Amino acid sequence: RRPVASINFVTAHDGFTMRDLVSYNEKHNEANGEGNNDGESHNRSWNCGVEGDTDDEKVLVLRARQQRNFLATLLLSQGVPMVLHGDELGRTQQGNNNTYCQDSELSWIHWEAMDQPLIEFTAFVSKLRHDHPTFRRSRFFDGRPVRRGQGEKLPDIVWLKTDGTEMLPEDWGSGFGRTIGVFYNGDGIQEQD
């Protein structure tokens, strides 16, 4: 199978929106009238230190960065990215991860509350994906060295440590690493779309 067979997503219609994914540790489905028993309780979310809405600037900055991290990872991964409508706008459902029964303010798009910096970031990363074929290859990376012209042979993909050196097999098992870099070699593309 090829990369186009992979549908990649962070959030979907069943579950938290991306903003809620970084704003709530727990679901808040009380408005659904089922005693908060409906919807998945295992959300793999992190509220960045405060449950729900906050005015804490440090928390808001971290949440914005986490949303950008998710969008960049999604849009620059191989395969087909699926963005939940409204995630690029910063849409919230106030922690409700199961709005199937909500035809109300809770599930509607609030156009006046759009997160303009997030929209601009999403547009920038989308254009980057569009303009650079290495982010949407027709075949997976295989690590083979490639060379075009007289230049040095470089693998089609290289995983990097924080100091810029190539990761070794033992680095993958390190429990303390929090950062990873990747180099995509555009010369490694064999077939153009």
Sequence positions of predicted segments:
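Short, contiguous acidic/charged loop-to-helix segments that flank catalytic cores in large enzymes
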Residues: 57-62, 112-116, 169-171
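Active-site-proximal helices and loops of the catalytic beta/alpha 8
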Residues: 1-3, 90-128, 132-135
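Conserved hydrophobic/aromatic beta-strand scaffold that supports enzyme active sites
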Residues: 73, 108, 179-183
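Carbohydrate-binding surface patches
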Residues: 154-193
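Short helix/loop capping segments that flank catalytic or ligand/cofactor-binding pockets
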Residues: 18-21, 93, 191-192
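Short linear interaction motif-like sites in intrinsically disordered regions of transcription factors
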Residues: 47, 109-112, 160, 173
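A structural signal for well-ordered alpha-helical segments within the folded catalytic domains
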Residues: 65-68, 116-123, 176-177
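Conserved alpha/beta catalytic core and glycan-binding cleft of carbohydrate-active enzymes
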Residues: 1-85, 98-102, 133-136, 140, ...
